[in-house]
A protein has these predicted regions:
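Proteins enriched for Cys/Gly/acidic motifs involved in redox and nucleic-acid/cofactor modification
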Residues: 1-174
Length: 174
């Protein structure tokens, strides 16, 4: 099965589970997806360290880097010899994440151009957790001087309430 390494917040945990499900269905057993965090410089340092370690331990596997650190500094991760592909936060929920080695090495768009309404792909459960997470919104419209999140996640966008209810019902049934 594909390996997904999650660094950072609960939203990354949810998104990692979605990517794990899609990568498994696509048969990407030779791939490691690293979902990064950028809330501190230390988080980015740990992401680079994790990438190097995973490549050293699994030299034959493709490494895809995504998440907030990848969104904010795609060129930094693309310059790492260990990295095969860098995917932005808008793109990581697309099936395009799963494209093979012939796809573009960096797929990161302007997060501020994200649509105001969106739905998160449904999942039936969390493979390695006893708690589930349900996304109700993403992004932030505030521009606090100390916070990088609006630039990594984009403007505030809400998930439609009916989608939230359906996701909760699916998770509780499983």
């Amino acid at each position: 099965a594909p390996q997904v390494v999650t660094l950072g917040c609960r939203l990354n945990t949810l998104e990692s589970e979605i990517m794990r499900s899609r990568a498994t269905k696509a048969g990407l057993n030779d791939t490691i997806i690293i979902n990064t965090c950028a809330v501190t410089a230390e988080a980015e340092r740990q992401a680079r360290q994790t990438i190097r370690r995973l490549h050293r331990d699994n030299p034959a596997k493709r490494i895809i880097v995504t998440g907030c650190a990848a969104q904010l500094r795609p060129e930094k991760f693309a310059a790492m010899d260990e990295v095969d592909r860098v995917v932005g936060n808008s793109e990581k929920m697309d099936d395009g994440l799963l494209e093979g080695p012939g796809c573009e090495a960096v797929a990161v768009s302007d997060i501020m151009e994200s649509p105001r309404n969106f739905n998160v792909p449904m999942i039936s459960g969390f493979a390695e957790r006893t708690r589930a997470f349900v996304q109700v919104q993403q992004g932030c419209d505030h521009r606090c001087t100390f916070c990088i999140i609006p630039f990594a996640r984009g403007p505030n966008r809400s998930v439609h309430p009916s989608h939230i209810i359906e996701q909760v019902q699916t998770l509780t049934a499983n």
